[in-house]
Amino acid sequence: LAWGLCLLRLSLAQIDLNITCRYAGVFHVEKNGRYSISRTAAADLCKAFNSTLPTMAQMERALSVGFETCRYGFIEGHVVIPRIQPNAICAANHTGVYILISNTSQYDTYCFNASAPPEEDCTSVTHLPNAFDGPITITIVNRDGTRYSQKGEYRTNPEDINPSNPTDDDVSSGSSSERSTSAGYNIFHTHLPTAYPTEDQDSSRVSSNSDHTPITKDHDSSVHPSERSHTTHGSESAGHSSGSQEGGANTTSGPMRKPQIPEWLIILASLLALALILAVCIAVNSRRRCGQKKKLVINNGNGAVGDRKPSGINGEASKSQEMVHLVNKEPSETPDQYTTADETRNLQNVD
């Protein structure tokens, strides 16, 4: 139980922040290896990094210099995934800045640092410059694996500090898993100004470009991010299929939604498991003590007084013993009687 309480305190007093490289000032932040950042906490976290939530234009600029993830995160006004290469398990196989219309409230976040270099910057971040005093141990985990810890706090909303809503137990950054909902998706797709793959896409998607001259091309052909322009597509229903590309047809889907497991339930289950283990150990120990065999000591009473004490314990057992006596019955006629009878018969025969 003491170990369980210790683990509970540690889980509540420590935050791990996994961050990526900066691309045109934009970077991704993940808390404690799962979707666990609210929109208010996202703004506070970016502020602690001396940054802000990026706008759509800033996210598109980051995409153009090579920024992509497989994790939903907050930007200004949206929840998005930036994708350059299509992947059936990331952003439903779409590319561009993929917008999610969600019915849940906790994801990762993206931040924008205006003082970062205009291209890619993978310099390690060592601290939260705008964090204030607090009891929480905040650990920054950079992409190269370096870790830097400090005591402090960055959240200002009491609901973010002591959440009452459960969070999704998801996987770490860059994983193939992502969140899927029953709501529709809006797509901010990017493409070449004079070409767009109209025939290879689903019929529900609407395409447009500056020339209004769509040219059919293979879906697998690559488009350099720097040559892309911003295009808005209509809402699309979140289907559930395998995302195959056979014969030029492209069927996409969102992954299965993971069940929501609150942190307090995980901690409670750990404590109950620990208590159960302790109870089993106590029961086994008690059974061993109660199950010890008692030795039966039989004394014939010839020893000293002290030696005869055990025989008193077994007195009842000795009283229950039965003595069996064998009694030899004598025959009704003695040998002398047999001899007299024989002589009488002999005399009668002589006469």
UniProtKB/Swiss-Prot annotation:
Glycosylation sites: N18, N50, N93, N103, N113, S173, N250
Spans annotated as Stem: 218-263
Subcellular location per the Swiss-Prot or TrEMBL entry: Cell membrane; Cell projection, Microvillus; Secreted
Chain intervals with Low complexity compositional bias: 172-182, 232-249
Region annotation (Disordered) ranges: 143-182, 194-256, 329-351
Primary subcellular site in the record, as a coarse category: membrane
Biased composition regions of type Polar residues, renumbered to the chain: 204-213, 334-351
Signal peptide range in chain numbering: 1-13
Residues reported in the UniProt entry to bind hyaluronan: R34, R71, Y72, Y98
Occurrences of domain Link (ranges): 25-113
GO biological process: cell adhesion; cytokine-mediated signaling pathway; inflammatory response; positive regulation of ERK1 and ERK2 cascade; regulation of lamellipodium morphogenesis; wound healing, spreading of cells
UniProt biased composition (Basic and acidic residues): 144-158, 214-230
Residues annotated as transmembrane: 264-284
Keywords attached to this entry: Cell adhesion, Cell membrane, Cell projection, Disulfide bond, Glycoprotein, Membrane, Phosphoprotein, Proteoglycan, Receptor, Secreted, Signal, Transmembrane, Transmembrane helix
Domain of life: Eukaryota
Residue ranges of the region described as Required for interaction with EZR, MSN and RDX and for co-localization to microvilli: 287-305
Extracellular side: 14-263
Pfam families reported in the protein's UniProt record: Xlink
Record-level GO cellular component terms: apical plasma membrane; basolateral plasma membrane; cell projection; extracellular region; lamellipodium membrane; macrophage migration inhibitory factor receptor complex; microvillus; plasma membrane
Subunit structure: Interacts with PKN2. Interacts with TIAM1 and TIAM2. Interacts with HA, as well as other glycosaminoglycans, collagen, laminin, and fibronectin via its N-terminal segment. Interacts with UNC119. Interacts with PDPN (via extracellular domain); this interaction is required for PDPN-mediated directional migration and regulation of lamellipodia extension/stabilization during cell spreading and migration. Interacts with RDX, EZR and MSN. Interacts with EGFR. Interacts with CD74; this complex is essential for the MIF-induced signaling cascade that results in B cell survival.
Domain remarks in the Swiss-Prot or TrEMBL record: The lectin-like LINK domain is responsible for hyaluronan binding.
UniProt-recorded name of the protein: CD44 antigen
Originating species: Canis lupus familiaris (Dog)
